[in-house]
UniProtKB/Swiss-Prot annotation:
GO terms for molecular function: ATP binding; ATP hydrolysis activity; magnesium ion binding; P-type potassium transmembrane transporter activity. This is Potassium-transporting ATPase ATP-binding subunit. Belongs to the cation transport ATPase (P-type) (TC 3.A.3) family. Type IA subfamily. Mg(2+) binds at residues 518, 522. It is an enzyme of class 7 (translocase). It is a multi-pass membrane protein. CDD domains: P-type_ATPase_K (cd02078).
Length: 682
């Protein structure tokens, strides 16, 4: 679910942004943007010159200098406004989160168990390791892990999703977020962070932090813009002695106007806004990025590691068939499979119990009365089961059961291998059931590939992004599903160690890797990946290891994250192209006007036939300021994104923003020149 989007020019945000734009005229704020700092200095210099001219301290046209000075200040204000508006939109999103933070009291337990004596303490005094009790209608006072109990939790204040979720002790759904509300039952929670370090605190700080760190690409582009600015500064500085030697020295006001029109002020004024807006768009998709660096990395990703279940398939694998080994009755296999699944709360485990009930009327046994020992599934063992009445029953992946059988002195039957291959070739997942060292047979689990996913992978492939399916299934099943879904590669029988090794392998090849995860066992791989999207429903360890958190806990969101990242990079590249192309057109307006008196031959460059030198220079300066405002919507919303190859994207960029950057100034400056002339302002 996405958050409600703010209108692009929300009146309250515009007013606040205008106030902030004026505050940002402070030289300390301007220094952070070298290109606009040059414009700020030029504005100050021309203001002083116009005052001196008005006071007859200096010769010259005071009105013309004042007009140039005024529009240079407007240029700086518009650049400040673009950044302030982008920041204001992010802060507005953060304010909705601030409303979740409530000063409340918590029941701090003296012992880590339900029913223990409790002390009433302010929620903001809870420390990491404290144990609290929350009951129906209570606000959860801190981020933490559920150590006892289970409850329905309303997380809409953070995720925007109205449907309640279940949080319970054990497994990957034990993580809770401070500020959410208990709807029913109770939880005993161990706080996992100190005050000021909660997930909500980090979200708010991230979206409204004034000191946003620049990303590597942003730094590289800033260096390029500074280099261009220095080149134009030196070139402009040399023009005065040339014109003076020619007998008609160009005024400092005109030289400043020339410099401002030639340096890349358009992208210089919008660069910060593009970065802030990219993070804001990510938040609009209900994904929290810990930094702009993470959003930028998403745009550069060329390998996606996608979990099969929930991302590529619908994730509701159901037991469809019991296939007994030679000499074993199907009912005996079903009975053992049901016993091994009684404590398995996964959808697959419940479906095995139900299938046994439907096929052979095997009623679900009372777990408490069995006096059995249940063996939970782990990523390392890849088995689960039950020990009951001297019977040791296990179900799990083929390789895991094979190792288990051989470790217990048994032999894995060849006919079961054939049955496993048959199930796998059909795209189903085979689970093998064993009692002691005797293999009883195979359970077939069927899953369905999501509609339209193959087309989405084809689009990613066109963009040069490799898709890799991660699954715990055996190689045959994985290969069948990979072929059906259209992924480029797959990792079968995946373990946390195997995922980590695969990420490192791709990174060693110079690739950037993105993945999702929700469990504690995903934390090492999430920490290693370049873009790591942790599920909000996952464990605290997973959320701390990732550099993004998906509030909707939707693994498919990873593809959208990559799209948003690429859109931000495309927006930056497109506006840079437009800005530099702009400079070429402004060259034809201002150079002839500034130097035609000294070098009449330059009149040949006056292809726009502007009214007079003063109107030409003023028109170029006005256009230079106004174009920033006209491009603010594009900077905030991003350019339209289409999955294309890199070469096709470059061609499209050059045609639209390169050619557009050349033509728009010719039209704009000519129109402004006509208006100034008609109104008698020059």
């Amino acid at each position: 679910m996405s958050r409600k989007q703010l209108a692009l020019f929300e009146p309250t945000l515009v007013v606040q942004a205008l106030k902030e734009a004026v505050k940002k005229l402070n030289p300390q704020a301007q220094w952070r943007n070298p290109v606009m700092f040059i414009v700020w200095i030029g504005s100050l210099l021309t203001t002083c010159i116009s005052i001196a001219m008005a006071s007859d301290v200096m010769p010259g046209n005071a009105l013309f200098s004042a007009a140039i000075s005024g529009w240079l200040w407007v240029t700086v204000l518009f650049a400040n406004f673009a950044e302030a508006l982008a920041e204001g939109r992010s802060k507005a999103q953060a304010n909705s989160l601030k409303g979740v933070k409530k000063t409340a009291f918590a029941r701090k337990l003296r012992e880590p168990k339900y029913g223990a004596a409790a002390d009433k303490v302010p929620a903001d005094q809870l420390r990491k390791g404290d144990i609290v009790l929350v009951e129906a209608s209570d606000i959860i006072p801190c981020d933490g892990e559920v150590i006892e109990g289970g409850a329905s939790v309303d997380e809409s204040a953070i995720t925007g999703e109205s449907a309640p979720v279940i949080r319970e002790s054990g497994g990957d759904f034990a993580s809770v977020t401070g500020g959410t509300r208990i709807l029913s039952d109770w939880l005993v929670i161990e706080c996992s962070v100190n005050p000021g370090e909660t997930f909500l605190d980090r979200m708010i700080a991230m979206v409204e932090g004034a000191q946003r760190r620049k990303t590597p690409n942003e730094i590289a582009l800033t260096i390029l813009l500074i280099a261009l600015t220095i080149v134009f500064l030196l070139a402009t500085a040399t023009l005065w002695p040339f014109s003076a030697w020619g007998g008609n020295a160009v005024s400092v006001t005109v030289l400043v106007a020339l410099l401002v029109c030639l340096i890349p002020t358009t992208i210089g004024g919008l660069l910060s806004a593009i970065g802030v807006a990219g993070m804001s768009r990510m938040l609009g998709a209900n994904v929290i990025a810990t930094s702009g660096r993470a959003v930028e990395a998403a745009g550069d990703v060329d390998v996606l590691l996608l979990d099969k279940t929930g991302t590529i398939t619908l994730g509701n694998r159901q037991a469809s068939e019991f296939i007994p080994a030679q000499g074993v009755e199907e009912k005996a296999l079903a009975d053992a499979a049901q016993l091994a699944s009684l404590a398995d709360e996964t959808p697959e485990g419940r479906s095995i119990v139900i299938l046994a009930k439907q096929r052979f009327n095997l009623r679900e046994r009372d777990v408490q009365s069995l006096h059995a020992t249940f063996v939970p599934f782990t990523a390392q063992s890849r088995m689960s089961g039950i020990n009951i009445d001297n019977r040791m029953i296990r179900k799990g992946s083929v390789d895991a059961i094979r190792r288990h059988v051989e470790a217990n002195g048994g032999h894995f039957p060849a006919d079961v291998d054939q049955k496993v291959d048959q199930v796998a070739r059909q795209g189903a997942t085979p689970l093998v059931v064993v009692e002691g060292s005797r293999v009883l047979g195979v359970i077939a689990l069927k899953d369905i590939v999501k509609g339209g996913i193959k087309e989405r992978f084809a689009q990613l492939r066109k963009m040069g992004i490799k898709t890799v399916m991660i699954t715990g299934d055996n190689r045959l099943t994985a290969a069948a599903i990979a072929a059906e879904a259209g992924v480029d590669d797959f990792l079968a029988e995946a373990t946390p160690e195997a995922k980590l090794a695969l990420i490192r392998q791709y990174q060693a090849e110079g690739r950037l890797v993105a993945m999702t995860g929700d469990g504690t066992n995903d934390a090492p791989a999430l920490a290693q990946a370049d873009v790591a999207v942790a599920m909000n429903s996952g464990t605290q360890a997973a959320k701390e290891a990732g550099n993004m958190v998906d509030l909707d806990s939707n693994p498919t969101k990873l593809i959208e994250v990559v799209h948003i990242g690429k859109q931000m990079l495309m927006t930056r590249g497109s506006l840079t192209t437009f800005s530099i192309a702009n400079d070429v057109a402004k060259y034809f307006a201002i150079i002839p006007a500034a130097f035609a008196a000294t070098y009449p031959q330059l009149n040949a460059l006056n292809i726009m036939r502007l009214h007079s030198p003063d109107s030409a220079i003023l028109s170029a300066v006005i256009f230079n300021a106004l174009i920033i405002v006209f491009l603010i919507p594009l900077a905030l919303k991003g350019v339209s994104y289409k999955p294309l190859t890199a070469s096709a994207m470059l061609r499209r960029n050059l045609w639209i923003y390169g050619l557009g950057g050349l033509l728009v100034p010719f039209i704009g400056i000519k129109v402004i020149d006509l208006l100034l002339t008609v109104c008698g302002l020059v």
